[in-house]
């Protein structure tokens, strides 16, 4: 043991008043930094501490030098005394009780970590690296290593961080309040990575709230536990520069994008029914998607959520990948593995609302902090959730920073923003009298509009490789147009009209389809009003809707033929593609989050044929610029047959500058049609590059023998083709 230094006589009182001792022991002292820790007393220094269970306390420097013996002021663990120091500095204590001895580094002897500029930018809402400042971060500070905790709770009387490291005692680590920003912070020395913690908050009324998880937590406990967990900074060795460079430098509207939508918890399961880890998913999902030709994987929300049947859409931890699949590093490895084989990763992201679980954001500091206080703006009647207050700069900053966090830290390629329509309209799912008009008397949520515009400006400004996709179900204009042109600034928008109209048409018996011909032609009137993604998503195979194959009419053969024809129709239609897992092999049953997909179906010819078709559609779509380069521009489309409602035949030409055109022809009746005359743009031989009725896909094998001949009859170029029943074919000129 090092020799104790001489302790100078302290002329000023180093003791603590009885009232302050009472407040410290009761956990009601709002600023223990003013009392505990090291303080100057005249020309000398004193140390005061609160160490429950201690009978004796010796003060030391961080390197172990003894600087004084402290006097017990209260039997519950309050000590104080003069210490031999020449300046304010952090100290450590050696505490004893009987034969037990332990060391405690004093959190109140450390200065603040955040600075005035952090306060300024946080309050202004322009801090774009809040995720490096807020939450829990392992740092070295004033010579010690530990966790810096920071949380926004401007209306709280007192905030403490509690966890495994202090026996969940809210009196031990009461945080320092930064009045300029409303942020509370504390550096907790010696706290390691991997420990659970929450915030204990005393509200405005002096009442303790339920313990709160960290809004900026980067890791959480596995449900049903709800605590946040201290996490190290990601140390992923990224090997994806070529992938990122490609998407930074290309016009995404002119690239092939075919998205495989995945619920990570139910794509596959282990034999015992438990969920796969990220590494297990990487070993199976990535090669599967690469083989299938999908360009992107879009995950249903993977941010931490407490309730499995919510599928992740009611998140309580926007910054933490859910613990269901392992640690955050596992997800980073998954993304890196995708990028190495050229597959992008899109996150389904939920900034519209949050659940009211008591450990979450609701009434976070005893007031409506993240949500509107008025339920007409702050409560969502459809989901019984709270709505973010988009008019509060700190809340907008929290959400924008979260989007930037996923793009920067995890190299995500896109964010699909959920429930945009519910954000845009003040009267969404509300009756008369249940909503508040905007300042102009309208139903537009102008604060949400500004948030979405700011979100897209920030994302594209800092991460041009990332794309944002809006799930917006109304006719709100210019969703995917630039902000400077009055748009919301999204890269793409889901085409809900396409999904609704085409599935409505396909569910009809073919004998009646002729009466509903316009359900398919109508969509081309607005197909280029936005940059569209055509979504056959999870929403279409849940809540009693059945699977896609189950929606098709007819006997089993006709159901499969209908779905094959529909898929090829969609892959030939202008717009990017999205297909929910299991639908690529025509799973019969409705999707359930509780179990894996019915992979056993692939042993059957018709299901394996469907999978092969989707695979071939993806590679055809990707390899033929005519099918993707003008997905979002009208010049890439030309009707060939638009009004043959009697035969339910549709045909069009897909085009791209300097590339061979592709003719897409669909027969939506079970009638085998020979010698069907169709106009084509050039004479000569046209090759059949895809036929959904091919035997390898489970079809009847009817077609055109691989090619057709277009003849120029006085300037009118036509060809006579065979249209298989319930089938789509694609043709391209040989020369």
Curated annotation (Swiss-Prot):
CDD domains: AmyAc_Glg_BE (cd11322), E_set_GBE_prok_N (cd02855). Pathway: Glycan biosynthesis; glycogen biosynthesis. It catalyses: Transfers a segment of a (1->4)-alpha-D-glucan chain to a primary hydroxy group in a similar glucan chain. The active site is at residues 418, 471. Pfam families: Alpha-amylase, Alpha-amylase_C, CBM_48, GlgB_N. It comes from the Bacteria. Keywords: Carbohydrate metabolism, Glycogen biosynthesis, Glycogen metabolism, Glycosyltransferase, Transferase. NCBIfam families: branching_enzym, PRK05402.1, PRK12313.1. Catalyzes the formation of the alpha-1,6-glucosidic linkages in glycogen by scission of a 1,4-alpha-linked oligosaccharide from growing alpha-1,4-glucan chains and the subsequent attachment of the oligosaccharide to the alpha-1,6 position. This is 1,4-alpha-glucan branching enzyme GlgB 1. The gene is glgB1.
């Amino acid at each position: 043991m090092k020799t104790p230094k001489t302790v100078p006589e302290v002329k000023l009182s180093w003791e603590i008043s009885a009232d302050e001792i009472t407040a410290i022991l009761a956990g009601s002292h709002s600023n223990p930094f003013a009392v505990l820790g090291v303080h100057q007393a005249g020309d000398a220094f004193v140390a005061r501490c609160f160490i429950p269970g201690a009978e004796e306390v010796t003060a030391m420097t961080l390197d172990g030098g003894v600087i004084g013996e402290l006097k017990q002021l209260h039997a519950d663990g309050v000590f104080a005394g003069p210490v031999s120091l020449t300046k304010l500095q952090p100290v450590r204590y050696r505490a004893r009780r009987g034969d037990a001895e332990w060391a405690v580094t004093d959190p109140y002897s450390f200065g603040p970590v955040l600075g005035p500029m952090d306060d300024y930018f946080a309050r202004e809402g322009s801090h774009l690296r809040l995720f490096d400042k807020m939450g829990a971060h392992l740092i070295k500070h004033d010579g010690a290593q530990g966790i810096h905790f920071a949380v926004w709770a401007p209306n709280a009387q007192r905030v403490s961080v509690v966890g495994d490291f202090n026996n969940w005692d809210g009196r031990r680590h009461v945080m320092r309040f930064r009045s300029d920003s409303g942020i509370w912070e504390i550096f907790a020395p010696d706290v390691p990575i991997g420990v659970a913690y929450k915030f204990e908050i005393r509200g405005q009324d002096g009442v303790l709230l339920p313990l709160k998880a960290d809004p900026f937590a980067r890791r959480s406990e596995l449900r049903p536990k709800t605590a946040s967990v201290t996490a190290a900074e990601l140390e992923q060795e990224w090997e994806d520069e070529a992938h990122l460079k490609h998407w930074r430098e290309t016009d995404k509207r002119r690239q092939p994008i075919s998205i495989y939508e995945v619920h990570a918890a139910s794509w596959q399961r282990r034999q015992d029914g438990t969920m796969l880890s990220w590494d297990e998913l990487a070993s199976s999902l990535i090669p599967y998607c690469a083989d299938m030709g999908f360009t992107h994987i879009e995950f249903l929300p993977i941010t931490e959520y407490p309730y499995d049947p919510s599928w992740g859409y009611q998140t309580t931890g926007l910054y933490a990948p859910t613990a269901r699949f392992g640690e955050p590093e596992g997800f980073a490895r998954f993304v890196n593995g995708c990028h190495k084989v050229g597959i992008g990763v899109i996150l389904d992201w939920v900034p519209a609302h949050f659940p009211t679980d008591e450990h979450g954001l609701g009434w976070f500091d005893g007031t409506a902090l993240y949500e509107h206080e008025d339920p007409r703006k702050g409560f969502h009647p459809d989901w019984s959730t709270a709505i973010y207050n988009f008019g509060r700069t700190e809340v907008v900053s929290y959400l924008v920073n979260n989007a930037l966090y996923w793009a920067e830290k995890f190299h995500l390629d896109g964010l699909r923003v959920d429930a945009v329509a519910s954000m845009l309209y003040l009267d969404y799912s509300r009756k008369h009298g249940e909503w508040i008009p905007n300042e102009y008397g309208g139903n537009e949520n102008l604060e949400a509009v500004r948030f979405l515009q700011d979100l897209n400006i920030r994302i594209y400004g800092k991460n041009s490789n990332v794309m944002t996709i809006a799930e917006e179900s109304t006719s709100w204009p210019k969703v995917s147009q630039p902000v400077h042109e009055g748009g919301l600034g999204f890269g793409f928008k889901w085409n809900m009209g396409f999904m609704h109209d085409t599935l409505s048409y396909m569910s009809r018996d073919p004998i009646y389809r002729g009466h509903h011909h316009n359900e398919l032609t109508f969509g081309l009137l607005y197909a280029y009003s936005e940059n569209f993604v055509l979504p056959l998503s999870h929403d279409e195979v849940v809540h009693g809707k059945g699977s896609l194959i189950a929606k098709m009419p007819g006997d089993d053969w006709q159901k499969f033929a209908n779905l094959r024809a529909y898929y090829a129709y969609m892959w030939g239609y202008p717009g990017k593609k999205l297909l929910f897992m299991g639908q690529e092999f025509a799973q019969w049953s409705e999707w359930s989050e509780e179990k894996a997909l019915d992979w056993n179906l692939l042993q059957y010819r018709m299901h394996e044929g469907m999978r092969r078709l989707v695979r071939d559609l993806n590679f055809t779509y990707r390899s033929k610029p005519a099918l993707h380069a003008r997905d979002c521009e009208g010049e890439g489309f030309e009707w060939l047959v638009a009004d043959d409602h009697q035969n339910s035949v549709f045909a069009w030409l897909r085009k791209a500058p300097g590339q061979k055109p592709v003719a897409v022809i669909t027969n939506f009746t079970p009638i085998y049609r020979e010698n069907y005359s169709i106009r084509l743009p050039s004479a000569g031989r046209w090759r059949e590059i895809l036929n959904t009725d091919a035997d390898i896909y489970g079809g009847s094998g009817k077609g055109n023998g691989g090619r057709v001949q277009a003849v120029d009859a006085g300037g009118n170029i036509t060809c006579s083709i065979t249209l298989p029943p319930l089938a789509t074919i694609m043709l391209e000129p040989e020369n």
